[in-house]
């Protein structure tokens, strides 16, 4: 067993099927990847494996780590996965998955690279296509695109590695202001994110973010109520989940808050029915604008603004879109599925069978 390798006992029985038993479609839960979110992705894969109906599907976890692609078998056993067709050996049997359930957070599973590979080998997968994945992974590009459809987003600037001096501190403070957030333009789980309160913190924060991405987004701070809402659509219909309210005990919803319990996640959110309906409607609309597929989750922050009539109202600002959202038992999506009165096993079955 390799050093720091996570052990997951996920192999189906290798005793074979009874004579005459129909073949179950083979589902590969694809996890790992090449970003700081590798281990988070493995936890999501464990969650999905526990949720999937294994009487209906034959399920394996496939971990990607650079050019090392391995299927998890019994105990610590691993099988090399062919990059030609994504097949692998289980004993003397060659297993060729019928479907890829992608749960890589970050590259290459959340930015279109892996989707392009599966398109080339004609294997259906759980997420949106190459264009949607690449756009939603690039926070700055996504913001500019959705602004054209009237979606409210924060003011932001982009800083690129090698051209850091093209955006001056004066420009940032004038157009964005302080405090502000400095974050990798392509990344997740709040790795490399800093809330900058003083000018002296700005450049160190940019350097930290560039450890995760060659592009850094400097984003205006918006005080308000943080919400998140999941959604998926298939030929059978649309499901927009109940809204979750996120109350962090940290400076912001950082890695510690997300994964170490320093947050209250309240589902359904303590908001008015009108605001709930607006958030759910916006989530559905963005799903359609982008042409998403599979389960997505959109994060928002609701701020107070004063209208021309002098009355205060809620403005819903889109923060980011997660196209491979976390799927552990305590992640937002399973919480929202339960709150909607649905069974996560049935949800995953619907998503998989919609693509087969």
Where are these regions (language model features)?
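ATP-binding N-terminal substructure of ATP-dependent carboxylate-amine bond-forming enzymes
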Residues: 1-131, 135-137, 141, 160-171
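ATP-dependent carboxylate activation and anion-phosphoryl transfer catalytic cores
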Residues: 2-9, 19-25, 273-356
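Active-site nucleotide/adenylate-binding loops and adjacent lid/helix of ATP-dependent enzymes
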Residues: 2-4, 20-31, 35, 135-224
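Hydrophobic beta-strand scaffold residues
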Residues: 59, 124-125, 153, 180, ...
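Short, flexible, mixed-charge acidic loops at enzyme active sites
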Residues: 74-80, 116-117, 252-260, 323
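Short Gly/Pro-enriched turn/cap motifs at secondary-structure boundaries
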Residues: 107, 184-185, 220-221, 287-292
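Phosphate-binding site of ATP-dependent enzymes
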Residues: 197-281, 301-317
């Amino acid at each position: 067993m390799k050093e720091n390798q996570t052990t997951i006992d996920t192999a189906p029985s290798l005793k074979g099927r009874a004579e005459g038993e129909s073949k179950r479609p083979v589902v590969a839960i694809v996890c790992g990847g090449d970003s700081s979110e590798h281990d988070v992705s493995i936890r999501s894969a464990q969650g999905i494996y526990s949720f999937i109906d294994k009487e209906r599907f034959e399920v394996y976890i496939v971990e990607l780590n650079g050019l090392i692609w391995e299927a998890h078998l019994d105990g610590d056993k691993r099988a090399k996965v062919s990059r030609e067709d994504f097949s692998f050996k289980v004993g003397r049997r060659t297993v060729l998955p019928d479907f890829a359930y992608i749960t890589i957070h970050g590259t290459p599973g959340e930015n279109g690279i892996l989707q392009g590979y599966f398109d080339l080998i004609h294997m259906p997968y759980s997420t949106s296509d190459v264009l949607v994945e690449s756009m939603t992974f690039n926070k700055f590009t996504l913001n500019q695109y959705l602004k054209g459809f009237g979606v409210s987003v924060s003011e932001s600037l982009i800083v690129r590695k090698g051209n850091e001096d093209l955006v001056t501190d004066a420009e940032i403070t004038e157009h964005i202001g302080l405090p502000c957030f400095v974050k990798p333009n392509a990344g997740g789980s709040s790795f490399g994110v800093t809330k900058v309160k003083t000018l002296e913190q700005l450049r160190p924060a940019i350097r930290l973010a560039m450890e995760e991405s060659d592009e850094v987004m400097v984003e205006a701070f918006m005080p308000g109520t943080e919400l998140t809402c999941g959604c998926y659509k298939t030929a059978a219909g649309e499901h927009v989940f109940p809204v979750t309210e996120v109350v962090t005990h940290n400076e912001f919803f950082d890695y510690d808050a997300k994964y170490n319990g320093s947050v209250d996640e309240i589902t359904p959110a303590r908001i008015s029915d009108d605001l709930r309906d607006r958030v759910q409607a916006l989530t559905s609309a963005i799903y359609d604008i982008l042409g998403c597929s599979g389960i997505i989750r959109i994060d928002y922050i609701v701020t107070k603004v004063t209208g021309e009539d002098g009355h205060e109202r809620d403005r819903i600002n889109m923060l980011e879109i997660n196209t491979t959202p976390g799927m552990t038992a305590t992640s937002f999506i399973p919480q929202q599925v339960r709150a909607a009165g649905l069974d996560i096993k049935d949800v995953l079955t619907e998503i998989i069978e919609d693509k087969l």
